[in-house]
Curated annotation (Swiss-Prot):
EC number: 3.2.1.78
Organism: Cellvibrio japonicus (strain Ueda107) (Pseudomonas fluorescens subsp. cellulosa)
Gene Ontology BP term (one): galactomannan metabolic process
The name this protein goes by in its record: Mannan endo-1,4-beta-mannosidase
Subunit annotation: Homodimer.
């Protein structure tokens, strides 16, 4: 049974939380053992990974998610403990999620912007270790700078990952900018190979390379590269990290945009291949107004990746999801959004088997808006008057209380499952 820790919530939020608790006491059958990995009779699980030499903990993470997804959908949040609207420290001990519901996200998202120099989003090693110590799952996306223009930075987005100058071909072996890409990968590998817990064991990471490649806003997008060129970039990067740099604690994720024509053929057009991918995902953002069609599309895409993952021995996820940024930044909201999302997913026999969904960050000062203003940029409703009064905090708390969502305390034995690996 999952309850909201009301001691940390203001009076209005406590009222809703107490209502949720009362419902639970009167018979809400929340799964007390949603993490089946905590059962005492667990037998070794056979896994086949991109890296046949992956660490025991990395293999266990994969096996855990394969089983966990049959029982619940884990909640993830980018910059869970390093950015927020209600936190006073960014040392990995506080989060907006925790302040809203009394628990951390199960999946903690970060990015190479905290790994590759100049670490624009701040170093995260200590925070990752804290998340891992409490049994959380770590995922890292890759906003690599444009290798072709990274020395020309000045006016945004020149030189960043959002610089749409085509650079895929020039970043591959034989290309003029391959050494630049290798430099990024070298820093990722050094970070991964030194990311260890207190016992000196490597901490597993779901590494999400070159996401949203079916759009055209990154230098690796569909207008910047052919499907074959993109596949070569993805494969090269995995091979370099795994075989050249000896990274043994990565699961590799592939995450295009959602498709409106939801077919396996469309998903596979730029897919690097089963040999190179452990996790199948997709990224999707939708409107506040008239969003019924978008929610149906989310379910359709989730069902597709779940079926494909089942057939291919992979893990299906929604790697990014949320209200589109322009609506958030305009101050628009949907105080049923989280409930619509979980209701739609769990009602579909395939979509309900995604392992996790992840929403984007809660920028503490927002982002630059028109005429020198700062506008909102957050995806987890915070425990503050604005979100209490507009009903979005209540919506998120209802999502938390749903029997089919899993947060940090709901998952156990993530890294202790016995496994046998297929080579």
């Amino acid at each position: 049974m999952k309850t909201i820790t009301t001691a940390r919530l203001p009076w209005a939020a406590q009222s809703f939380a107490l209502g949720i608790c009362l419902i639970a006491l009167l018979g809400c059958n929340h799964a007390a053992n949603k993490s089946s990995a905590s059962r005492a009779d667990v037998k070794p699980v056979t896994v086949k990974l991109v890296d046949s030499q992956a660490t025991m903990e990395t293999r266990s993470l994969f096996a855990f998610m394969q089983e966990q997804r049959r029982h619940s959908i884990m909640f993830g949040h980018q910059h869970e403990t390093t950015q927020g609207l209600t936190i006073t420290r960014t040392d990995g001990t506080q989060s907006d999620t925790f302040n809203a519901v009394g628990d951390f996200a199960a999946v903690y998202g970060w990015d190479t912007l905290s790994i590759v120099a100049p670490k624009a989003e701040g170093d995260i090693v200590a925070q990752v270790k804290k998340a891992y110590a409490r049994g959380g799952i770590i995922t890292v996306s890759s906003h690599f700078d444009n290798p072709k223009t990274d020395t020309q930075k000045g006016v945004w987005p020149v030189g960043t990952s959002w610089d749409q100058t085509p650079a895929v071909v020039d970043s591959l072996p034989g290309g003029a900018y391959n050494p630049v890409l290798n430099g990024y990968l070298d820093q990722v590998a050094e970070w991964a190979n030194n990311l260890k817990d207190e016992q000196g064991r490597l901490i597993p990471v779901i590494f999400r390379l070159y996401h949203e490649n079916t759009g055209s806003w990154f230098w690796w997008g569909d207008k910047q590269s052919t499907p074959e060129q993109y596949k070569q970039l993805f494969r090269y990067s995995v091979e370099y990290l795994r075989d050249v740099k000896g990274v043994r604690n990565f699961l590799y994720a592939y995450s295009p945009n959602n498709f409106w024509d939801v077919t396996e053929a469309n998903y596979l057009e730029r897919y690097p291949g089963d040999e190179w991918v452990d996790v199948l995902g997709f990224d999707t953002y939708g409107p506040v107004a008239d969003n019924a069609d978008w929610f149906r599309n989310v379910v359709a895409n989730a069902a597709l990746v779940a079926r494909m993952a089942e057939a291919r021995g992979k893990i299906p996820v929604i790697s990014e999801i949320g209200i589109r940024a322009p609506d958030i930044e305009a101050g628009l909201y949907d105080n049923q959004w989280y409930r619509k999302l979980i209701s739609g997913l769990k009602a579909d026999p395939d979509a309900r088997e995604i392992a996790f969904l992840l929403v984007w960050r809660n920028a503490p000062q927002g982002v630059p808006g028109p005429n020198g203003t700062q506008v909102p940029h957050y995806w987890v409703p915070a425990n503050r008057p604005e979100n209490i009064n507009n009903g979005t905090l209540e919506d998120f708390q209802a999502f938390y209380a749903d029997e089919f969502t899993a947060f940090n305390r709901d998952i156990e034995q993530v890294y202790q499952r016995p496994t046998l690996i297929v080579k």
